[in-house]
Amino acid sequence: MPAFPKRSKVDAGERAYAYAKACGIIGKSFVGKRISALGKLNALNEFGRLVFPEAAYELPGRELLVELERRLLQRTIRHILAVIDSYSNPPELLVRQLRSCEYADLKTCLRHIAADKPIPATLCDIGKYGTVRFKAYPDLKAMIGGTEFEFILSKDLKAANFDINSLEAEIDLQYYTLLMKSLQRLPAEDRLFAQRILAEEISLRNCVWALRLRTYFEKTSEETEKYLMNLEIPECPPAEIPGDINSRFSSQRDADSGRISLAQEAFESLYFPLDARSAWKGWRWESLLNPEEGREAWTANPRFFQNAASRYIYRLSMRCFRRLPFSVNAEFCYIKLKHFEEDLLTSVAEGLGLGMGGNDVFNLLEVPA
């Protein structure tokens, strides 16, 4: 591990407190060995008692599911804020991670505005870190005027031929661009593992988009290219993460800038047939594709790939969480773990609401019980 300069006492104290908070919360979260408890559930009220033992739930099925999803979102935000607020001046990277839910909610609101639907039932509240004024819905100018989202005001959401997917891709690009910039402003120690994990996430997100657009929307390879986030990063530092899938090849590095394209794998995937798995052999993310099943015809499954990608980022975050305990890397991984947990808990709750068992949901998501 490379040597890094010592930190001031005040900074070290805040970092130690934030890390202790994160460790305490992770110990009670449904990650690692505690995930298995979710596979034993068979009803929504059991789920409610396990995750929120302090509350009583007497609501009917559908209403109970909505209430639990609302509480899960609040729980995740509360747990992330508990760590971020340990800092007198929180690192911008962590605040931008927190604000991912604001970006997601804004995209949902834009779809609702375009379709003349009422305000979504559940929206995040991240307190002083929020910038979108959701209470002004559906007045878009009042919602986002003066924020980093003001560029959206030039779009005609209700035009007959308006491409909402293209706008969402633009919003995603802005989120990850600003996230990467905040990462690069940190000292080397604080971005050692965070940069690796974020680079993998962006690459995989591009690949998921490419698969979804080609499969569900029947976009051509040329049409799909414009939706991808063609972001670049400096060559990742030589930090080994157990379970990392194939180090990046030198061919991905721009000869002039020495930087790595995070759209490279997605661009490569655009020219692989969706019905011949053998053609994907040698592709960096090949192991995350759905396997061939006997003599059945194979077709690329975007949902399978997305679930596998999510588990991969989770495993990297889990392995890196404690490797540099008093650096921003730890809190970065912590927030990744909390987001994974929220997605998993929401999926289990939705499955139970449909009459599935927890183990059935695990099988659907390819999560080991």
Predicted regions located by residue number:
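N-terminal domain-start signal
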Residues: 1-369
